[in-house]
């Protein structure tokens, strides 16, 4: 169990780092990160806080649909949101930061290998697909 939790922690940390890299590359963002940036600008809060708020809404929808909630989703929602803000402030703004695209696949692979469930976004997509 300790190994699985370590994989989840490392995957979440690396995923947060990769998201911060992509944001600081100024070349674009992942779709959900782009939404978090837009909501953060609209509310006047950081990307991490807006990401947390979006995850809370997704969690509410999942609970309303009587879908399961995973440890991975909860860790991403809390720790991931904090780490994104930390890494965005620590990393330089540079086009070379697009390296985050390569790191993201490895990060989410680590989270998946931990076997502690899917992220909230994946759970929501699965719930929608089951109902269509």
Label the predicted regions.
Residues 1-132:
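Core subunits and conserved enzymes of cellular information-processing
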